Amino acid sequence: MKTIYDIIIRPVLTEKAVKDNEKKNTLTFEVDMNASKTEIKEAVEKIFNVKVKEVRTLIVKPKPKRFGFRSSGYKKAWKKAIVKVESEKPINIAELV
């Protein structure tokens, strides 16, 4: 059985994710590939003590990666969840990490 900390792997702290956090009141996470939207919603509500409005998920495709001059491969695919919360002021993820 997956715990809430197995579902949410890490927050995504890109420039776009931080801007959306401030303006649209959303949180962005890397989540387990097999996690459903309801599992993600319950995990975020328990960890951050907030009410979740909606959860959007997407699969980030693998990108090519080089290992030195000759060998190359791919980074693995991962699942991203964008969670919209109902709190009045935005949650600062950078302080919590």
UniProtKB/Swiss-Prot annotation:
GO annotation terms (biological process): translation
Matches recorded under InterPro entries: Nucleotide-bd_a/b_plait_sf, Ribosomal_uL23-like, Ribosomal_uL23/eL15/eS24_sf
Q: Name one GO cellular component term.
A: ribonucleoprotein complex
Sorted alphabetically, which keywords does the UniProt record give?
Answer: Ribonucleoprotein, Ribosomal protein, RNA-binding, rRNA-binding
Q: Which PANTHER family match?
A: 60S RIBOSOMAL PROTEIN L23A
Tell me, in a sentence or two, what this protein's role is: One of the early assembly proteins it binds 23S rRNA. One of the proteins that surrounds the polypeptide exit tunnel on the outside of the ribosome. Forms the main docking site for trigger factor binding to the ribosome.
Q: Which NCBIfam families match?
A: PRK05738.2-4
Tell me what this protein is called. Answer: Large ribosomal subunit protein uL23
Q: What organism, scientifically named, is this protein from?
A: Sulfurihydrogenibium sp. (strain YO3AOP1)
